[in-house]
């Protein structure tokens, strides 16, 4: 992105063309270049005239260098072209004249505030000076875009004195970053406004954020973060959506060139305080690195990824909730040897048909198997020993279409109280009565009494 302070001699403008809208107002397309950064600004003649008046009054610009106003014939193509050339010469002249002391009015006219490091930081400083305490109250979230974080990162490298006006001081930005506890970052593969800047082509660092407890990122390029070290000491919850992560270490070790992990790795690389991660809607195929990089984690959400198998996560002794919805899991084996004392497991929207592997998950309380391929009602018998289970979802499976599905499920699972929830619905009294009657009939048929249950 632009940095006029360091590239003032590489700044130039041209008016590449003009457009007349349906209201017969003519706009001139100004292309601004600062080094390799370029953007386009659309202005009408009136805005040139307003700018010129300010420059004449406050910055000793010669009054007669702006092309004159014309009332009659000002929509003729020849006149518009002559005016385009004249306005281009005008802009180039004042830019050359004011290069070393670029006035705020000219920065605003050319929309530097949207693309320039110093002006973006200046805008942030003003915002935090006025409203920073409001944003920080109650640990509220603040959303930064990648452009703003790049600007802060670059400003840290510049030996520029603070502004004479206190509200513009960079210290307001640093103080806000230091105290912020809920940081959200938004990126994107698209251009920034009318420029050649792409959000996710900008690198940035997060060394100024030393109190963040919750980190959220949406559509970012994790490889563009070159310092995330302070967050490893404070963050408890991480959410990374739609960012094309291949592995958890893509973000957890984003500031390391070689993203290698092992059980004896440097403790400074480990996120010891993280209790939950949400890596939904990425391209993750394995969770293995979490066993080392987030050893104290309790909740993992990797919905909407590319996982095909459930790995051994027993090293995560505090793990209680695991969500693997919308992945590519077709078969599961020996889950009790891989998931420890899991309480909640979501495997909805996969391709599972055999439930044998679930038979020894004795700690499970909530199990979501909705929208899988379970077709045979006999598979439900593998869940009958899960006595702690009080929530089960099977809707969306072929088995849920059988006659008297709900009462058959409740009967097989021996769930005869309203505390149990099947497919997000508690049993009705009628369903409970039906299950009780069928149970009594079965006992009678077997020659048992109710006290022999």
Give the ranges of each region predicted by the language model.
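Generic preference for well-ordered alpha-helical elements
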Residues: 45-48, 52, 80, 84, ...
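Phox homology (PX) phosphoinositide-binding domain
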Residues: 1-169, 438, 444-453
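Short amphipathic alpha-helical segments embedded in low-complexity Lys/Glu-rich regions
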Residues: 28, 46-47, 63-76, 102-113, ...
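Amphipathic alpha-helical interaction motifs in eukaryotic regulatory proteins
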Residues: 31, 46-56, 67, 88-96, ...
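Leucine-rich repeat domain C-terminal region
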Residues: 199-210, 222-247, 252-270, 274, ...
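Short amphipathic alpha-helical molecular recognition features
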Residues: 22, 33, 39-43, 47, ...
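Beta-strand cores of modular interaction/reader domains in eukaryotic scaffold and signaling proteins
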Residues: 14, 29-31, 39-42, 49-50, ...
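LRR N-terminal entry segment and analogous cap-like coil->beta motifs
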Residues: 129-300
């Amino acid at each position: 992105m632009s940095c006029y302070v360091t590239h003032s001699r590489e700044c130039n403008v041209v008016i590449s063309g003009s457009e007349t809208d349906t209201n017969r107002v003519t706009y001139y397309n100004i292309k601004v270049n600062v080094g390799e950064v370029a953007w386009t600004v659309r202005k009408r003649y009136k805005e040139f005239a307003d700018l010129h008046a300010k420059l004449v009054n406050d910055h000793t610009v010669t009054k007669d260098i702006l092309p004159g106003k014309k009332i009659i014939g000002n929509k003729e193509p020849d006149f518009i072209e002559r005016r385009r050339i004249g306005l281009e010469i005008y802009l180039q002249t004042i830019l050359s004249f004011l290069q070393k002391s670029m006035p705020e009015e000219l920065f605003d006219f050319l929309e530097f505030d949207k693309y320039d490091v110093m002006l973006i930081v200046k805008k942030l400083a003003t915002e935090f000076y006025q409203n920073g305490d409001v944003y920080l109250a109650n640990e509220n979230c603040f959303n930064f875009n990648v452009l703003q974080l790049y600007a802060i990162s670059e400003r840290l490298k510049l030996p520029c004195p603070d502004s004479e006006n206190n509200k513009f001081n960079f210290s307001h930005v640093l103080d806000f970053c230091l105290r912020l506890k809920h940081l959200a970052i938004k990126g994107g593969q698209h251009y920034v406004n009318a420029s050649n800047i792409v959000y996710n082509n900008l690198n940035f660092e997060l060394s100024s954020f030393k109190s963040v407890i919750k980190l959220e990122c949406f559509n970012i390029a994790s490889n563009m973060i070159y310092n995330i070290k302070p967050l490893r000491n404070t963050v408890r919850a991480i959410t990374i959506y739609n960012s094309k992560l291949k592995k958890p270490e893509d973000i957890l070790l984003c500031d390391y060139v070689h993203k290698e992990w092992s059980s004896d790795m440097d403790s400074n690389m480990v996120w010891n305080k993280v209790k939950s991660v949400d890596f939904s809607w990425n391209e993750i195929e394995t969770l293995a690195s979490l066993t080392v990089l987030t050893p104290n984690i309790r909740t993992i959400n990797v919905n909407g990824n590319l996982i095909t198998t459930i790995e051994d996560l027993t090293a995560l002794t505090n793990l209680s909730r695991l969500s693997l919805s919308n992945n590519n899991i077709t078969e599961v084996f020996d889950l009790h040897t891989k998931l420890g004392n899991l309480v909640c497991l979501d495997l909805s929207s996969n391709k599972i048909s055999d439930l044998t592997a679930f038979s020894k998950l004795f700690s499970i309380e909530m199990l979501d198997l909705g929208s899988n391929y379970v077709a045979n009602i006999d598979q439900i018998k593998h869940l009958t020993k899960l006595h702690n289970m009080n929530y089960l979802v099977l809707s969306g499976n072929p088995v849920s279409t059988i006659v008297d599905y709900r009462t058959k499920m409740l009967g097989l699972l021996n769930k005869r109280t309203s505390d149990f929830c099947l497919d997000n619905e508690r049993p009705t009294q009628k369903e409970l009565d039906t299950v009780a009657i069928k149970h009594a009939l079965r006992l009678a048929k077997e020659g048992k009494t109710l006290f022999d249950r």
